[in-house]
A protein has these predicted regions:
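Long, low-complexity intrinsically disordered regions enriched in Ser/Thr/Pro/Gly
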Residues: 1-17
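N-terminal, Lys/Arg-enriched amphipathic/low-complexity engagement segments
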Residues: 15-35, 44-45
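Conserved ATP-binding subdomain of kinase catalytic cores across diverse folds
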Residues: 31-159
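Short, glycine/acidic-enriched loop or turn micro-motifs at the edges of active sites
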Residues: 83, 153, 201, 206, ...
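Short glycine/proline- and charge-enriched loop/turn segments
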Residues: 103-109, 157-168, 214-222
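Conserved kinase catalytic-core helix
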Residues: 110-138, 142-143, 158-197, 202, ...
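A glycine-rich phosphate-binding loop feature that marks nucleotide/adenosyl-phosphate handling sites
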Residues: 145, 203, 259-261
């Protein structure tokens, strides 16, 4: 069989599967993120029995959409689909990849290949943090531009972010959350040996029992990254600013630094 004939049959097979997906209502929402390549990736995740059904959007951003999904055992999952056509996003992520030894040998021929690498970077960061005991969603799988992880929420709704929930909390509860936030930052740096890079009230979920979950770790870099200290200082400033200006707590930067500085010195990272 000639190559052209093989390609034609593959295209027909893909179109047939796409129609079947829509006909069987495996997708409840079809948006611009579902280009042909992304549909193929979703199909492959279904073939591997990782996903059974995609539901509605949990959250949206400039670079991705997160959907509620279900696995073959009925377990709820969060599916993050990165947009592969965002040129602006491509520019914004270079500073996190340049200097990362995990990407030294990778060559990005186009925006899609870069975004795929970015999705896999988040999966690896999630796995590393999860194994280090950081409170993050459990990573399940990553294929092309799609990341599958544990869903954290109730009744098909994700847990609220710190920025969404803090106004309903007491001063004592906010003090408790500040301590938890510092402890998780310490675990990210000292146990996972990473810097989050965007540690803020927008990337911390609050559970009903006031436990926290750290999300959006794609930009996290290793401590050896040339900009690691700069990113860490920014993370600390983000937390300090929020708990002082928004939560109105009487705290000091040193309360955050004191938890991290000893292990930075131990790992040979100069903090000043």
């Amino acid at each position: 069989m000639k190559r052209d004939e093989i390609d034609r049959l593959l295209r027909e097979k893909t179109r047939m599967w796409e129609r079947r997906i829509k006909d069987e209502d495996l997708f409840e929402v079809v948006e611009e993120v579902f280009d042909t390549a992304t549909v193929k990736t979703v199909l492959e995740l279904m073939r591997r029995k990782i996903l059974r059904k995609l539901n509605g959007v949990i959250s949206t951003g400039k670079e991705s959409r997160v959907y509620l999904a279900y696995g073959f055992s009925g377990e709820p999952l969060a599916v993050k689909i990165y947009l592969t056509s965002s040129a602006e996003f491509r520019k914004s992520i270079y500073k996190y990849i340049t200097g990362d030894p995990r990407f030294e040998k990778i060559r990005f021929k186009d925006t899609r290949s870069l975004i795929i690498a970015w999705a896999h970077k988040e999966f690896r960061n999630l796995k590393r943090m999860y194994e280090a005991g950081v409170k993050v969603p459990k990573p399940v799988a990553c294929l092309d531009n799609i990341l599958v992880m544990e869903f954290l929420g109730e009744e098909n709704a994700r847990y609220p972010l710190l920025v969404e929930a803090y106004k309903e909390l007491t001063s004592e509860e906010l003090k408790y959350l500040f301590q938890l936030t510092c402890e998780e930052l310490k675990k990210i740096v000292c146990k996972a040996e990473l810097v989050h890079g965007d540690y803020s009230e927008y990337n911390i979920m609050i559970k009903p029992d006031l436990d926290i979950v750290i999300i959006d770790v794609s930009q996290a870099v290793e401590l050896s990254h040339p900009n690691a200290l700069e990113f860490l200082i920014r993370d600390i400033e983000n937390i300090y600013r929020f708990f002082v200006k928004e939560a109105k707590l009487d705290i000091h930067r040193e309360q955050i630094w004191s938890k991290i500085e000893p292990c930075l010195k131990e790992k040979g990272v100069q903090s000043s």
